[in-house]
Amino acid sequence: MFGSSNNNPFGQSSISSPFGTQTHSLFGQTNNNASNNPFATKPFGTSTPFGAQTGSSMFGGTSTGVFGAPQTSSPFGASPQAFGSSTQAFGASSTPSFGSSNSPFGGTSTFGQKSFGLSTPQSSPFGSTTQQSQPAFGNSTFGSSTPFGASTTPAFGASSTPAFGVSNTSGFGATNTPGFGATNTTGFGGSSTPGFGASSTPAFGSTNTPAFGASSTPLFGSSSSPAFGASPAPAFGSSGNAFGNNTFSSGGAFGSSSTPTFGASNTSAFGASSSPSFNFGSSPAFGQSTSAFGSSSFGSTQSSLGSTPSPFGAQGAQASTSTFGGQSTIGGQQGGSRVIPYAPTTDTASGTESKSERLQSISAMPAHKGKNMEELRWEDYQRGDKGGQRSTGQSPEGAGFGVTNSQPSIFSTSPAFSQTPVNPTNPFSQTTPTSNTNFSPSFSQPTTPSFGQPTTPSFRSTVSNTTSVFGSSSSLTTNTSQPLGSSIFGSTPAHGSTPGFSIGGFNNSQSSPLFGSNPSFAQNTTPAFSQTSPLFGQNTTPALGQSSSVFGQNTNPALVQSNTFSTPSTGFGNTFSSSSSLTTSISPFGQITPAVTPFQSAQPTQPLGAFGFNNFGQTQIANTTDIAGAMGTFSQGNFKQQPALGNSAVMQPTPVTNPFGTLPALPQISIAQGGNSPSIQYGISSMPVVDKPAPVRVSPLLTSRHLLQRRVRLPTRKYRPSDDGPKVPFFSDEEENSSTPKADAFFIPRENPRALFIRPVERVKSEHPKDSPTPLQENGKRSNGVTNGANHETKDNGAIREAPPVKVNQKQNGTHENHGGDKNGSHSSPSGADIESLMPKLHHSEYFTEPRIQELAAKERVEQGYCKRVKDFVVGRHGYGSIKFLGETDVCRLDLEMVVQFKNREVNVYMDESKKPPVGQGLNKPAVVTLLNIKCMDKKTGTQVMEGERLDKYKEMLKRKAGEQGAQFVSYDPVNGEWTFKVEHFSSYKLGDEYDV
């Protein structure tokens, strides 16, 4: 197949053997018997080891010896030839394969290549033009006619390929390819390709090939012509513009500027103003430009005295439209309703016959002609403007970066030196006073632009170290009490640390970080004239006439333009506002800025957190703010905070409003130094025991004007478990809300204004023996002498609680005598508390009584003992039924819901048999019961049967059912579903659902 002389597919000499052996063995062995098989089974201990060949070779050899033994014949079908001989390899015939000659491994190449290590000249299969003798590897010395790597046979179409360093004829289309370092012949289309280091192609930094726009490209450090628009850059160490040299450059690149010397003023960068030299009291910081991109030089104006433009679209003192970033230019607002400020524009209503109808619409403005309101809203939505404050960098005139206008900006700063700025709506901006006072003009107010870029304002250049948002400090020219680089996250300087390069200026104090960390030891947190207020609720008191606000809260300004009775309003829908005079203004993040009074300087107040967790154990300085001090947002008082002396302003109290409206404001009633918090409870303890309390007449002469003060004074109802069911009450007998006035309640309401003395609501009730006078002691106190053996208990407060009370009259001789005390006890109701305790308990609104409990209390007040003999008393539940107790019934202190329970078509009275009184007593007496929802229903159709034979059968069933339960049938109303029957005593009466027809 591959050049062999036989038909054997692998070129063997034998026809029948597949691998060229002389016998019919599988792998060229002479025979396949067991004696010659090296892998055949042999007995243990034979002389022939495993794998030894006694006969013919396994792979074509005549004899295969033991491993390592010499062989008598060549294995694998080869004759004993040396390595690299010309005898064919395994299975090869005399006729060579395609394109090869008769050579073993290492012989002549079959595809035109020479043998490895042989020097016999061979012919190329591709018809190359030259056939040189090629020495073996290592036979020729380096640098001979055919060095290492050179080939006598050139590439396709090439005349010859020179070796490394040899100049010879070049390749495709080239006249010659020079060696490494050659100087003449170039490649394809090239005029001249010089060697390495030749002068035709300049080296790096040479002057032949110039850069874009430059005359030549100088070497590193040379002083040749610069690039396009750039100034010549001097070499390192040369005198072109060395450090400290004040030489002006000829011209810079587009928007760039040359670096000025140390302290020298020079032409600034694109749009930035120049930096003056380093002098005492210089306006900017050391080596700092007063404006940034698009702020000063390019298309904006320098602001007035002391005011420095902000780099991020800030508002300065002068309103001018920037050329770069102006309206309908780069960075401007291209659409929406805020292209220009809204101005009321009158338009004629279209589509009406009458032209007198006019309306005002934003679409009528000249800037919005051809657009309706929906289109403007869509444009606003496309720009992400959904109302509220303006977004970052947005200006109402459509100005981009660097526009100085008179509208509020997010990153705006305020001008200095007695200029009235526009009221900023910036949540991140530093607040400045809205007006100047006549006593302390707020000049030298520093302006703090965006993201902590410090700019130093005007008069005498007194710089306050404004803390950067990203932790970078401002300038080197300030005299501050904190080190450079204070961050927003509360790093506090060491005590007495002062940076270098401190210059003139007065009262430079530190500004606080963004998130309100407190300064270190002995740091002054009360700033001077040039101090700005922090952002998020740091407790710093601003200077005279300076008001601080975070999110649009208008605090009380300084003396000149502030109304004494003005009301502060906030940006949160008046949730934090309170109408007060001379009160503190509560900031949303816990900063309280006291209003400045004409007769008192600003006092540092106590900081209040956003959620009312106030300071512990601090003493508030006397001020003319709210009487009880400032309260937290959620009406939590300052724990153990005692006002200092002098806090005795008598004025109308101002309750601090609650932002969520869930809890009423605290009443502040005091005319002298007393407690700070009234006796008011919140939560479950302040809930009334009943839904509809008894109408107790309260007509005090001196009471609190606050409604809450009067409401908590209402007495509560007691629960008497002695004569009720086993239900566990919510308020037990000992858990009533005491209505005893606390020590800080200066005005106590009186039950009866005609009384001769003021006494608490919970009066002392005692029982005295019949006809036994009780003399008064010398100190005017009554003795607690009791002779009838009644149970009594003395509480800690000295009050005696006994039952039943008796009416006590005072004689002229100063003794008290009991009139009408008997064994049963007569209930006297001289006060509303006693009447309330006699009323039956009815908590759920679904239950009702006839007469109502309010009517019972009114009749008991007029006629004592009325509740013991209520005629035809009715108790019921709406939608379930009612019970009419015949005759007179004693309803005093009954918990009706524990005794009477209505369910669907069922009523139970005294379910607990152990609590049931004998027949005729309590509610276990004759009564007429009416159950509702007793209707004759057809089970198949689900309709109500109103007449017919089926209704008569249903009525007969009700009569039979009443008789079975010991009741007497009275009537049945099929329309209303009322079943009325009479009982002599009470148990459980019901009608199940199985009695429907």
Curated annotation (Swiss-Prot):
Superkingdom of origin organism: Eukaryota
Comp. bias intervals (Polar residues): 1-53, 70-88, 116-144, 345-363, 403-422, 480-490, 505-552, 774-791
Compositionally biased intervals (Basic and acidic residues): 371-388, 760-771, 814-825
Coiled-coil regions listed: none
Name listed for the protein in its UniProt record: Nuclear pore complex protein NUP98B
Additional remarks: Unlike in mammals and yeast, NUP96 and NUP98 are not translated as a polyprotein.
Keyword Nucleus set for record: yes
Listed GO MF terms: structural constituent of nuclear pore
Any one Gene Ontology cellular component term annotated for this protein: nuclear envelope
Source organism of this protein record: Arabidopsis thaliana (Mouse-ear cress)
Domain topic, free-text comment: Contains FG repeats mediating the translocation through the NPC by interacting with transport factors.
Record flagged with keyword Hydrolase: no
GO BP term (any one): mRNA transport
